[in-house]
Amino acid sequence: EELGVRLLERNSHEVVLTEPGEAFLPNARRTIDDAETSKLYIRDLQHLKTGVLNVGVTYSFHPIMTETVLTFMRRFPAIRLNIFYKRMEDLLEDLQKRQVDFVLSYKPLHALPSIKSRELFRTQLAAITAVDHPLAGQKSVTLKELAQCDLAMPTNGLQARNFFNRFAEKSDLHFNVRFQLNVVHMLLDLVGRSRLVSVLSASTVKGHQEVVAIPIDLPENEMIGCIHTLEGAYEKYAAKEFLQLLRQQNDLQEMVNSM
């Protein structure tokens, strides 16, 4: 009534936006976002170590999460921590919808203007084999050598697979993909018990003694681990503390120093 136009149409089955309602919707969303930001800012000013922290993580980042999560929970017992493991594309979409506070993943192949990425570490795309596999003792492996192996691969859409596909599509080689899976720790388990070879980031094998990572001999073979936040969004006190703990933890420091 205050606006002088009808924003919603109701019938016995549903409520839908009118044309003025569609036009007004972006402003309404911005108002809600601004109100939520103000609430977070006031809470942080009062140093209230309470609330919820929503973190999006891709599967490859699992090795660096455990120590940070346990330390954070001990230090901030009143903050509820929600960790979401998904594909990078899905997590970045969640970030844009403000459903997560930040995302930990590798840098996407194509930058998104609404998202700010800060580097954590660098690693390489690698062939993952059992420790007693014939390739395990090599310092590097070529695509031609991989084409001669039975492969157990991460599914299309996962970052390591996307990175590999970019190089594979430029070659004239055929790769014998015997198995695809979107659960990285199960891939590592299968590879460690067989002669299958997988392709993942070298950092993925951290903490898995039954497998080794052999860098793939490729131009510009570098994967950049990043913290992704929404451009211009307010960063919670809890998020700053979590990321500070993450940067200080030993597993991440080993990754940084290994490159």
Feature map (PLM): residue ranges:
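A short LG(V/I)-centered, amphipathic sequence patch enriched
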Residues: 1-19
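Short beta-strand-centered segments that line the small-molecule binding cleft or hinge
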Residues: 26, 67-71, 89-125, 129, ...
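N-terminal winged-helix
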Residues: 40, 46-76, 80-84, 89-92, ...
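Flexible hinge/capping segments at coil-to-helix
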Residues: 46, 114-151
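A late-sequence structural motif
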Residues: 64, 213-256
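Hydrophobic hinge/microswitch elements
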Residues: 87-100, 106, 159-214
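Secondary-structure junction motif
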Residues: 106, 136, 149-171, 235-243, ...
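Beta-alpha-beta core module
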Residues: 112-118, 122-124, 138, 185-234
